[in-house]
Amino acid sequence: MARTKKANDEVPTDSDSLKLKVAKQAAKLVKDEMVVGLGSGSTANLFIQELGKRIVEEELYIYGVPTSFDSRMVASTAGIPLISLDQCGEIDIAVDGADEVCKSTLSLIKGGGGCHTMEKIVDYHAKEFIVLADEGKLVDSLGDKTPVPLEVIPFAYSTILNKLLKMNTAPVIRTGSGKMGPVITDNGNMIIDVFISIDDAEETEIMLNNIPGVLENGVFSKCDKVLIGTSKKVEILKK
């Protein structure tokens, strides 16, 4: 008897298949006895699941460093042994997703899931930082379509909003679904989303972090390699 499709069943999209394609290829880059930074988000979760399969099938000794409560749960389910940042001397490779990738500079905007602070700590700490994305995430100019998230200390949110308004931006406090009020990060902070012109990713990253009360922002100026899923193949972009 054929299964009746329910209204809330998720139907795979072209984007989903491209994400899975890059996730599978990224999982092959991990070698035995590596410590791996585990990013957060839909593409990173696929990578975590594929890495878990390799660990089981090939009996690999690999440890993961999660960047969020969500990635911790996905990794635990996938059978990846986990350690904290202070337990590992170094991270061999970090694999993460992105909301936008600039074609020319490989700078990124991350943080759609509100995990960018922990992601940046782990990603920047790694010997090699690899980003996974489908071709729809590629842009010519960073920040034209996606706002930059700022994780802010609640005590300072109003002064940060005023500072951003004086910079001729339109900041918005991120609110969640399922509850009233602002989104609260794993670190207990709020998120302000702001559209801002980004001519130099590194300068913008530093400038936003210099605003008192901003813990971290979603501009990532450092990235070693990007795996882009296209309909024909996985393209590898390097700096």
Curated annotation (Swiss-Prot):
This protein's name: Ribose-5-phosphate isomerase A
Catalytically driven reaction(s): aldehydo-D-ribose 5-phosphate = D-ribulose 5-phosphate
One GO term of the biological process aspect: D-ribose metabolic process
Keywords: Isomerase
Enzyme class: isomerase
Residues at the active site: E119 (proton acceptor)
Associated pathway: Carbohydrate degradation; pentose phosphate pathway; D-ribose 5-phosphate from D-ribulose 5-phosphate (non-oxidative stage): step 1/1
InterPro entries named among the record's database cross-references: NagB/RpiA_transferase-like (IPR037171), Ribose5P_isomerase_typA_subgr (IPR020672), Ribose5P_isomerase_type_A (IPR004788)
HAMAP family for this protein: Rib_5P_isom_A
NCBIfam families associated with the record: PRK00702.1, rpiA
Short name of any one Pfam family annotated for the protein: Rib_5-P_isom_A
MF GO annotations: ribose-5-phosphate isomerase activity
Taxonomic superkingdom: Archaea
Function statement: Catalyzes the reversible conversion of ribose-5-phosphate to ribulose 5-phosphate.
Record-listed E.C. numbers: 5.3.1.6
